[in-house]
């Protein structure tokens, strides 16, 4: 795995190397769905240890640092982003972000410090919230017809993934229920950055 300090030395990644993962630019929700699928099929870790994490807020304006889309010290302002969280039985949790310049996977505490920094220095309208969904629930319930990636003329803003759209027996498109940070909507639990860090950071492992 990519270097990430002594705590990561004995950790065996739940995924293939970054460049071997299923990846389509600007389709982070599907990239993480495919990563959950890989973990389920390869059975190296219990799927129950893994979570899809949607990051957004009411305004759909969230700064994330250390993104490939913005080399250097500045953040990217996404409308939403999706990463995978592995709550490892080894005592350290890891974040898998296919769009970061940080290690893949990255120690949770390192990722939070470098990619999210602190809400204290961020205007309230940009503060991030986190919807954390168990990977098995994400695989079962997520659906996207990719319509959000088409412009008003029906043209793709970014080329779609080469595989068929992900759908369920009940839905062809429920992406907004995952992006929403209303705890009454959708699946999983919604956290502030402070709550997310306290829940999954190393001090509470």
Swiss-Prot record:
Q: Which family does it belong to?
A: Belongs to the NTAQ1 family.
InterPro entries, from UniProt? N_Gln_amidohydro_ab_roll_sf, NTAQ1, Prot_N_Gln_amidohydro_ab_roll
Gene that codes for this? NTAQ1
Q: Which GO terms fall under molecular function for this chain's record?
A: protein-N-terminal asparagine amidohydrolase activity; protein-N-terminal glutamine amidohydrolase activity
Domain of life of the organism in this record?
Answer: Eukaryota
EC number assigned by the record: 3.5.1.122
Spell out where the chain crosses the membrane. Answer: none
Write the record's keywords in alphabetical order, separated by commas: Cytoplasm, Hydrolase, Nucleus
**Record Pfam families:** Nt_Gln_amidase (PF09764)
Asked if the record carries the keyword Nucleus, the reply is yes
Where it sits in the cell: the answer is: Cytoplasm, Cytosol; Nucleus
Enumerate the active-site residues: 28, 81, 97
Could you tell me the Gene Ontology terms of the biological process aspect for this record?
protein modification process
Outline the subunit composition.
Answer: Monomer.
Sum up the protein's function in the record's words: Mediates the side-chain deamidation of N-terminal glutamine residues to glutamate, an important step in N-end rule pathway of protein degradation. Conversion of the resulting N-terminal glutamine to glutamate renders the protein susceptible to arginylation, polyubiquitination and degradation as specified by the N-end rule. Does not act on substrates with internal or C-terminal glutamine and does not act on non-glutamine residues in any position. Does not deaminate acetylated N-terminal glutamine.
A GO CC annotation recorded here is:
cytosol
Is Cytoplasm among the key words of this record? yes
Its protein name is Protein N-terminal glutamine amidohydrolase
């Amino acid at each position: 795995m990519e270097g990430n300090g002594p705590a990561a030395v004995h950790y065996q990644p739940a995924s293939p190397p970054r460049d071997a993962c299923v990846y389509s630019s600007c389709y982070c929700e599907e990239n993480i769905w495919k990563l959950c699928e890989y973990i389920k099929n390869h059975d190296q870790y219990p799927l129950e240890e893994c979570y899809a994490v949607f990051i957004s807020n009411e305004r759909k304006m969230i700064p994330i640092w250390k993104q490939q889309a913005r080399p250097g010290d500045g953040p990217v302002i996404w409308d939403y982003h999706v990463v995978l969280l592995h709550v490892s039985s080894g005592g350290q949790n890891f974040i898998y972000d296919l769009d970061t310049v940080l290690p893949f996977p990255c120690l949770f505490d390192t990722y939070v410090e470098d990619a999210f920094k602190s809400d204290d220095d961020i205007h309230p309208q940009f503060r991030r919230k986190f919807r954390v969904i168990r990977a098995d629930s994400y695989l079962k319930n997520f659906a996207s017809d990719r319509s959000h990636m088409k412009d008003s003329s029906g043209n793709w803003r970014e080329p779609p993934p080469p595989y068929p759209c992900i759908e369920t027996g009940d839905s062809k498109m429920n992406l907004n229920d995952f992006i929403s940070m209303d705890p009454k909507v959708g699946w999983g639990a919604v956290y502030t950055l402070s709550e997310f860090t306290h829940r999954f950071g190393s001090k509470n492992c």
